[in-house]
């Protein structure tokens, strides 16, 4: 810091104007933000790709991006019906073309009728296009066995991430020991730790139980809450189901216990359910927090506050780039809900193409429509392939000495634990790196495989992990798993 001040003083003496915005004058909360999924490992992967394009010789011919859940970047084909409707919405002159099915045309016409100037390029209202919010409400009702959903409690968003951050902005307040504490699962999706750092909230970690397939334990929630009350005011409990990066699917009994705990302790519940279509393990089933809450009856159904989130980026869709999502709020204070609408209006509106895509996700072709057969086949193919990849990943890792992988019950990732030799840990410390960061960097440099170290998600002290997506095409995934297992054996031998 002193050197930067001296540099500015020297600039002043030389007649040069110093920068107004520096690392010292910028928002300190932003400096604390970290996002491992796009952190140093990924930056190095980009450099390696550039070097390969320039003809630099490497021990590999391509960088395999297994660091992020971007399905289409990994080769997954878009759902035909979704793209047909989007094409019609973007260029309505195609509505007269015989190359598009009639149900796609009807869907596009309905969306365009709800847009300002009948154009996807117009702003929508801040909470999202009304007929699309109505379709989201009907989807939630179907998903939850007829439990009513009110479109006025649904806000469309720029992906689920935007809605999550907006909700946290509403919830975070106070200073000192009165600062809002937010309970998040460890391992966690780094969006949460990054958002809490930016908002200057207190992150309260509760650990998932790796020995029980990343189970959520109420006793652990209670421990985290009690310890946090000495330093903050815990007000929020976040649950990711299915889990990211851990891939577990919560049982109904667990969800009921979490709701009872939140109600008893006066916590606002945030349920991140963007992987609700991604459930693979036999015996596992997705249960929405909204459905369980309502079926529990009063006082839970009438008093427990809940926000649940969904997205077009995951599931079988994989439409990450369109940035479509929604949040449904339950039992929210009416005046606070108005403030939420105000906060969203500052950003004008979510991307309208993303809203249109969300409409197709929640209102896909029905059995009586011409596009249904192809849509259903494409959807089932994607989910069946993901299930096979999840099983393969678990099997290969568990056959490799020094690697242990829990069942990938859902979502799009495996989060295996790796044993690292003491000499490797010591070498990492000499370099100022977390041991699993050192392992992942070495893996990238030697094999071109880009994964994210577990330290970026949080983990029990003394354990090491990495997160790897299961999205690559099957043959590439087999090769990736084989190369990774061989590298770990070589790495272990080298540092033993």
From Swiss-Prot:
Record carries keyword Cytoplasm = yes
Which residues in this protein are found as N-acetylalanine?
2
Q: Which domain of life is it from?
A: Eukaryota
Tell me which SUPFAM superfamilies the record gives. PLP-dependent transferases (SSF53383)
Residues with the Phosphothreonine modification? 22
**Where in this chain does the entry annotate a coiled-coil region?**
none
Name the UniProt key words of this record, in alphabetical order.
Answer: Acetylation, Aminotransferase, Cytoplasm, Phosphoprotein, Pyridoxal phosphate, Transferase
Where is the chain membrane-spanning?
none
* E.C. code: 2.6.1.2
Q: Which residues carry this modification: N6-(pyridoxal phosphate)lysine?
A: 314
What cofactor is needed? pyridoxal 5'-phosphate
GO CC terms in record: cytoplasm; extracellular space
What Gene3D superfamilies does the annotation carry?
A: 1.10.287.1970, Aspartate Aminotransferase, domain 1 (3.90.1150.10), Type I PLP-dependent aspartate aminotransferase-like (Major domain) (3.40.640.10)
Q: Which GO annotations describe the biological process of this protein?
A: biosynthetic process; cellular response to insulin stimulus; L-alanine catabolic process; positive regulation of gluconeogenesis; response to nutrient levels; response to starvation
Induction note: By glucocorticoids.
Q: Could you tell me which Pfam families the record lists for this protein?
A: Aminotran_1_2
**What does the UniProt entry say about where the protein is found?**
Cytoplasm
Query: Which one of the record's GO molecular function terms can you name?
Result: L-alanine:2-oxoglutarate aminotransferase activity
Biological or metabolic pathway of the protein: Amino-acid degradation; L-alanine degradation via transaminase pathway; pyruvate from L-alanine: step 1/1
Tissue-specific expression:
Liver, heart, skeletal muscle, etc.
Substrates-to-products reaction catalysed: L-alanine + 2-oxoglutarate = pyruvate + L-glutamate
Job of this protein: Catalyzes the reversible transamination between alanine and 2-oxoglutarate to form pyruvate and glutamate. Participates in cellular nitrogen metabolism and also in liver gluconeogenesis starting with precursors transported from skeletal muscles.
Q: State the PANTHER family in the record.
A: ALANINE AMINOTRANSFERASE, ALANINE AMINOTRANSFERASE 1
Subunit structure as annotated in this protein's UniProt entry: Homodimer.
Q: What family does this chain come from, according to its entry?
A: Belongs to the class-I pyridoxal-phosphate-dependent aminotransferase family. Alanine aminotransferase subfamily.
This one is known as: Alanine aminotransferase 1
What organism does the record attribute this protein to?
Rattus norvegicus
Task: List the gene name.
Answer: Gpt
């Amino acid at each position: 810091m002193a050197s930067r001040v001296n540099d500015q003083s020297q600039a002043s003496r030389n007649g040069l104007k110093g920068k107004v915005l520096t690392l010292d004058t910028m928002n300190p909360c932003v400096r604390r933000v970290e996002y491992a999924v796009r952190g140093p490992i990924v930056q190095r992967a980009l450099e390696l790709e550039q070097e390969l394009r320039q003809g630099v010789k490497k021990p590999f011919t391509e960088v395999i991006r297994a660091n992020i859940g971007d399905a289409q970047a990994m080769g997954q084909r878009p759902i035909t019906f979704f793209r047909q409707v989007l094409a019609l919405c973007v260029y309505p002159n195609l509505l007269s073309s015989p190359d598009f099915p009639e149900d796609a045309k009807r869907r596009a016409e309905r969306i365009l009728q709800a847009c300002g100037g009948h154009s996807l390029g117009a702003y929508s209202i801040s909470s999202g296009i009304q007929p699309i919010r109505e379709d989201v409400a009907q989807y939630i009702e179907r998903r939850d066995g007829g439990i009513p959903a009110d479109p006025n409690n649904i806000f469309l968003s720029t992906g689920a991430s935007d809605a999550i951050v907006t909700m946290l902005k509403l919830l975070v307040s106070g200073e000192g020991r009165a600062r809002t504490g937010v309970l998040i699962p460890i391992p966690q999706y780094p969006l949460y730790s990054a958002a809490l750092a930016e908002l200057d909230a207190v992150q309260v970690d509760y650990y998932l139980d790796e020995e029980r397939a990343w189970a959520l334990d109420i006793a652990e929630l209670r421990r985290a809450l009690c310890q946090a009350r000495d330093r903050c005011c815990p007000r929020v409990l976040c649950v990711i189901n299915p889990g990211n990066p851990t891939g577990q699917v919560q049982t109904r009994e667990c969800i009921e216990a979490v709701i009872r705990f939140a109600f008893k302790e006066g916590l606002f519940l945030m349920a991140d359910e963007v992987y609700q279509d991604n459930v693979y393990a036999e015996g596992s089933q997705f249960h929405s927090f909204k459905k369980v809450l309502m079926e529990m009856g009063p006082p839970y159904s009438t008093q427990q506050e809940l926000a649940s989130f969904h997205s077009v980026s995951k599931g079988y869709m994989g439409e990450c780039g369109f940035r479509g999502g929604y949040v449904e709020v339950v039992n929210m204070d009416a005046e606070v809900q108005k403030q939420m609408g105000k906060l969203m209006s500052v950003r004008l509106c979510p991307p309208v193409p993303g809203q249109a895509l969300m409409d197709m996700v929640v209102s896909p072709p029905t059995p009586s429509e011409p596009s249904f057969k192809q849509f259903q086949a494409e959807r089932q193919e994607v989910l069946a392939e993901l299930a096979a990849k999840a099983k393969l990943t678990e099997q290969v890792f568990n056959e490799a000495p020094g690697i242990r992988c829990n069942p990938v019950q859902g979502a799009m990732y495996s989060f295996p634990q790796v044993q690292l030799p003491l000499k490797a840990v010591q070498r990492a410390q000499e370099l100022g790196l977390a041991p699993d960061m050192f392992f992942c960097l070495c893996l990238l440099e030697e094999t071109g495989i880009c994964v994210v170290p577990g330290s970026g998600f949080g983990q029990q002290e003394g354990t090491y992990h990495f997160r790897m997506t299961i999205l690559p095409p099957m043959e590439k995934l087999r090769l990736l798993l084989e190369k990774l297992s061989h590298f770990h054996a070589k790495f272990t031998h080298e540092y033993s």
